[in-house]
Amino acid sequence: MITVRLPVSLRTTADDVLHVGDEVRSIADLIDLLDRQVPGFRDQFEQGGFNVAVNDELVIHGVHDHEVHPGDVVEIFPAIAGG
């Protein structure tokens, strides 16, 4: 099982954690799953609205192809810009 931590804007329940099974093998699979649960998520993600970390490591390059495995913790959080 993979644990996915979600920001408030993506929660479909009061819980901030989603558990997904073997059907999710990559961040691309996770994006597909979340887009079915939260319509418009894919568009927001593709426009740079969110960042992804897997096991506390920020995924910067090749996000869609990044593999996830049982026991991983994936965090999706809003992208923040500033200077």
Enumerate the language-model features and the residues they cover.
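Ubiquitin-like/PB1-type beta-grasp interaction modules and other compact soluble beta-rich domains
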Residues: 1-82
